[in-house]
Amino acid sequence: MARIAGVDIPRDKRIEVALTYIYGIGLTRAQTILSKTGVNPDTRVKDLEDGDVQKLRGATEAFTIEGDLRRQEGMALKRLQDIGCVRGRRHRMSLPVRGQRTRTNARTRRGARKTVAGKKK
C-alpha cells in the first residue's frame, strides 16, 4: 500500500480512484494532480514506481487535505456558533441550517424521535 498524506491508499484500484480515499480530494482534484505530475490515471497503485509516489506526495501538499481541512471546517463552524448568528445557533441545536422545514421531516439532523406520553383525560 502506498501512503500519501498519512492515508493508506488501496493497492488494487486505479490511482485516479485511489486518490479520492484522501479526505479533501475528489475525482476532479485527483485528475488535476495526475495531469500535473504526468502519471497515467489508468495505472494501478501497486504498479506505481517510487518516483511517481514522491511526485504525487509533492502535488498533494499544495492542497489543504485530511486533518488540516477537518480542523479548518471545525473552526468555521465554531466561529459561526461563537458570533451567535442564526446558522451557528442552528448548528448548536442540531437543527437544519439551510431553511428546511422541521415540523415534519428533518429526522436525520434531529435524531430518533423522543416519544412523549399522551395527556390523560
Curated annotation (Swiss-Prot):
Subunit structure: Part of the 30S ribosomal subunit. Forms a loose heterodimer with protein S19. Forms two bridges to the 50S subunit in the 70S ribosome.
GO MF terms, alphabetically ordered: rRNA binding; structural constituent of ribosome; tRNA binding
Organism of origin: Synechococcus sp. (strain WH7803)
Basic residues: compositionally biased ranges: 100-121
PROSITE patterns reported in the protein's UniProt record: RIBOSOMAL_S13_1, RIBOSOMAL_S13_2
Classification via NCBIfam families: uS13_bact (TIGR03631)
Similarity comment: Belongs to the universal ribosomal protein uS13 family.
Role of this protein: Located at the top of the head of the 30S subunit, it contacts several helices of the 16S rRNA. In the 70S ribosome it contacts the 23S rRNA (bridge B1a) and protein L5 of the 50S subunit (bridge B1b), connecting the 2 subunits; these bridges are implicated in subunit movement. Contacts the tRNAs in the A and P-sites.
Tree of life domain: Bacteria
Name assigned to this protein: Small ribosomal subunit protein uS13
Annotated region described as Disordered, given as residue ranges: 97-121
A family per Pfam: Ribosomal_S13
Gene3D superfamilies for this protein: 1.10.8.50, 30s ribosomal protein s13, domain 2
Keywords on record: Ribonucleoprotein, Ribosomal protein, RNA-binding, rRNA-binding, tRNA-binding
HAMAP family assigned to the protein according to its UniProt record, in alphabetical order: Ribosomal_uS13 (MF_01315)
Cellular compartments per GO CC: cytosol; small ribosomal subunit
GO biological process: translation
